[in-house]
Regions:
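Cleavable N-terminal export/targeting peptides
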Residues: 1-31
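Gram-negative and organellar
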Residues: 25-389
Length: 389
């Protein structure tokens, strides 16, 4: 097995002159002011060892040292009633023991918020992603290559502190695959989604909510059994700073109507995210979700129930640790297959300087499946360096 290349430490010297000035906020990367625009560059260098980077059965798994160079650039501006942000990320990953897995991911996103007055706000976003994935492909030898384009817009009526608030959001996404021999072309789709939410304030810190969702999954392949309409109706609560907790809870029913099949599935659905801060420097997070996801591996849909528990503790202004564990049950609709996935992770980060953070982490994944060839274990060991201005 090849040894990893030694990560080189690059020293950056930034000259600030003329209309350029350096803006620094505690705990955040600094930005350069460029004639009214805030420009924030960051760089993440990492080296990791992945003993099963394609997520294969233990008899077939492949391991490698992986070097990553991940710069990120954010350009943003704010006025009295609006905000704009343009972000570009590029992540180059080198697999030292399998060059065929080498790839570079590109992510471009634009976001904007317009506040007409205290009761009316408009937001919209555009995005483009060109990705390669070593897992989740019908081909266990080559990467899964795809592009994702999306456009979305949302409107909020009513102030956050008011008695009632209405929020609506529409989103359109195109997903295309770039694999040779048409691998995963059956998963190409256009997705149109709408979410509408009504919030009603119960107390100063707690709001009740009612939400409806509509999603049209239009697959390009003719008579694709995954083409469907997803709908859901949910009720719940949203609260802030109540007994040191913040969170949102939604529970309801979800339905998935397939166009080319007599099968229509419905099930209880829920989403919850709760943060508990027993101390100002310690946070326990719990999230859970039960819902239908789009199918793969010949399944027309995947019914997933997942729970995650995490704990982040700041031991000092420089040192922080994280522990997390998650469990997921997956039912593959249309197949006689059920998976159970457990993931455990831990990390330690050390802020060497305000602009340099070193992090080491470990993650273990175990997937058990009624389909014996889909069972696997995976371990990832990582060392990273985060740089900013």
């Amino acid at each position: 097995m090849k040894r990893p290349m030694v990560l080189a430490t690059t020293l950056f010297t930034t000259t600030v002159a003329g209309s350029m000035s350096l803006h620094v906020s505690a705990g955040e990367p600094a930005s350069i002011n460029l004639a009214g625009f805030d420009f924030t560059p960051t760089l993440k260098l990492s080296e990791r060892y992945d003993d099963n980077f394609r997520g294969l059965n233990n008899d077939e798994k492949k391991s490698s040292w992986i070097s990553s160079i991940h710069p990120s650039f954010i350009l943003e501006a704010e006025t009295r009633n609006s905000g704009y942000q343009l972000q570009y990320d590029v992540d180059n990953q080198t697999y030292h023991d399998d060059p065929s897995a080498n790839h570079t991911d590109h992510i471009l996103a634009f976001r904007s918020v317009l506040e007409f007055n205290s009761r009316n706000r408009l937001r919209y976003d555009l995005g483009y992603k060109r990705l390669e994935q070593t897992v989740d492909t019908a081909d266990n030898v080559d990467n899964d290559r795809l592009t994702i384009k999306n456009a979305g817009a949302g409107y909020t009526y009513g102030s956050f502190q008011g008695l009632n608030q209405l929020d609506g959001h529409v989103d359109y996404e195109q997903r295309r695959y770039l694999n040779p021999n048409g691998v995963n072309d059956d998963r190409e789709r256009n997705t149109t989604a709408f979410v509408g939410t009504w919030y009603h304030r119960l107390t100063g810190k707690t709001r009740a909510l009612t939400e409806v969702r509509y999603t049209d999954f239009d697959y390009l392949q003719s008579h694709n059994p995954r083409t469907s309409i997803g709908t859901a109706a949910l009720v719940g609560l949203s609260w802030e700073a109540t007994a040191r907790t913040t969170g949102t809870l939604r529970i309801g029913e979800e339905r998935k109507d397939f166009n080319d099949s007599a099968r229509d599935d419905r099930s209880p659905t829920w989403e919850a995210g709760i943060d508990w801060k027993p101390l100002t420097y310690s946070t326990v997070s719990l999230s859970t979700r039960k819902a239908y996801d789009e199918g793969n591996d010949d399944a027309i849909a995947i019914h997933q129930q997942k729970t995650r528990l995490g704990w982040k503790h700041e031991w000092s202004s420089r040192i922080a640790t994280e522990l997390n564990a998650s469990h997921a049950d997956l039912e593959y609709e249309g197949l006689d297959r059920e998976d159970r996935t457990n993931v455990y992770g831990t990390s330690v980060s050390y802020a060497v300087r305000r602009w340099v953070t070193v992090k080491t982490s470990y993650q273990h994944t175990r997937n058990e499946s009624t389909e014996s060839t889909e069972a696997y274990t995976r371990n990832i060991y990582l060392l990273s360096f985060d740089f900013s201005l």
